Amino acid sequence: DDVGGSATNLINHDEPEDIYEIVRKEAEKGMVLDNNPDFTLWGSGGCLSRALVKRPVMTTPYGATLYGMRDQIHEELKKQLDKGTVFPGIDSGTDLWPHCKYLAIHIYEAIGRVVVSSRKGMKWLQDVAKASNKLKRPIYWTLPTGFVVKQKYIRSVVKQIKTIINGRMASLFAGSSDAEKMHNFRQVNGIAPNFVHSLDACHLMKTVVSAKDNHGIESFSVVHDSFGTHACDIEQLGIVLRETFVDLYKEDILEKFMNEQGDLDLPNLPEYGNLNIEDVKDAEFFFS
């Protein structure tokens, strides 16, 4: 996806791109066109901040829903009001929920316009999970490193037990699970983030192995998809990161995933964008 890839610095730019700011501007543009008289402060009023947009954008790969985004925006808006941020027409007695719902709708739509292919890919993975649920099957996939991932969320049951302890009534909660009953909702909601995280882990492993075996780098500091090493090796690590990323994604990862799903009745693969994955090697701000 060349649009989403550009917004996330997968191609070279003179300055780093900021996907949160890109989505903010896109949402603001949509609200200006909408011109709803009850919410003009967010569009033409220019009050939509980057902070209000950040969490909805960050949690989109984790299956964030419209309602979830509304709640995130409500939490952030209250935080900003508590700090003393002034929003024209909003005071301590204002019902924030209509504003949050309106913002969530436009931010959700703006994200879809900025990361077009990512959202299509996420929906396709969720459709695969739904098809797997119909056959009551876990989902398996094999990473390029050979590691086999199994996703199987078990449905658990929590029972409340009332009893007397030291002469007083107490409530205890006991949980149990049935290994044969999958949690269908979690299977669907978890597939996209789990798939992405598995590829992040694969990229990490390939990077560390290549950096050590080919360049003698033995010290690493890693948190999720954040990579670090000593200052003397940081430039070389940046090169290795780009090389292993391209090596990982030049394969058709989704097609390989689809072929591992056996006899499931699957939807067609989503249409791919025009990003040239080799451009990552020249993307200055891919790793910084």
Regions found by a protein language model. Give the residues of each.
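Conserved catalytic core of nucleotide polymerization and phosphodiester-bond processing enzymes
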Residues: 1-288
